[in-house]
Amino acid sequence: MKRAVVVFSGGQDSTTCLVQALQQYDEVHCVTFDYGQQHRAEIDVARELALKLGARAHKVLDVTLLNELAVSSLTRDSIPVPDYEPEADGIPNTFVPGRNILFLTLAAIYAYQVKAEAVITGVCETDFSGYPDCRDEFVKALNHAVSLGMAKDIRFETPLMWIDKAETWALADYYGKLDLVRNETLTCYNGIKGDGCGHCAACNLRANGLNHYLADKPTVMAAMKQKTGLR
């Protein structure tokens, strides 16, 4: 039996990964992390979607220690979430230091226990947000370290790594879940479900990708299939 664990926030990317994983694996587990994030509504959204989509199990892990250590606009209400700035340089204040290091490591421990061969995460380098822990080289390096430390070949899969946001919408549509992803996920840094607040960086990236996809579905769908190997 093929098993996988999806790092699941209830947002567009991780929900699309879950939808695909349910088609590719016999048993899919979800793990969601409560790190005291400002947009904590995502945890309830993740619970609802994991149940609705048919995950075998869904664990919500308390990692609020991260909140004490990692200062970010996503962990401190005293730091405002910035509006999208297309020319902004450097690492944005929405970056939570160590978040993906912790999430992927804990997901791998869970995968070890449930005998899953893969940990799936929706990180992406194409629409690079300035987060160093979304890079392909980081994921591969951590995967190598975790496999060595557990003496077990647990594979970190990043199905969205080389597709852009428009193609991520195409992937959801390929599996017949575009409306679900659009209306029932929570990507917004301000904790607003669906299309979100419309002005944070996450909402801007999501909306631009959707508009691009809807404006030229055949071309974007073809590009997504070529990059992912889907038919």
Swiss-Prot record:
Swiss-Prot/TrEMBL keywords: ATP-binding, Ligase, Metal-binding, Nucleotide-binding, Queuosine biosynthesis, Zinc
One GO term of the biological process aspect: queuosine biosynthetic process
Pathway stated in the Swiss-Prot or TrEMBL entry: Purine metabolism; 7-cyano-7-deazaguanine biosynthesis
Residue stretches in coiled coil: none
InterPro entries attached to this UniProt entry: QueC, Rossmann-like_a/b/a_fold
Pfam family, one: QueC
Note on how the cofactor is bound: Binds 1 zinc ion per subunit.
Residues binding Zn(2+), per UniProt: 188, 197, 200, 203
Catalytic activity line of the entry: 7-carboxy-7-deazaguanine + NH4(+) + ATP = 7-cyano-7-deazaguanine + ADP + phosphate + H2O + H(+)
EC numbers on record: 6.3.4.20
UniProt-annotated binding residues for ATP: 8-18
Keyword Zinc: yes
One term of GO molecular function: ligase activity, forming carbon-nitrogen bonds
Tagged with keyword Nucleotide-binding: yes
Domain of life: Bacteria
SUPFAM superfamilies: Adenine nucleotide alpha hydrolases-like
Cofactors named for this entry: Zn(2+)
PANTHER family named among the record's database cross-references: 7-CYANO-7-DEAZAGUANINE SYNTHASE (PTHR42914:SF1)
Known function: Catalyzes the ATP-dependent conversion of 7-carboxy-7-deazaguanine (CDG) to 7-cyano-7-deazaguanine (preQ(0)).
Similarity comment: Belongs to the QueC family.
Name under which the protein is recorded: 7-cyano-7-deazaguanine synthase
Taxonomic source organism: Shigella flexneri serotype 5b (strain 8401)
The encoding gene: queC
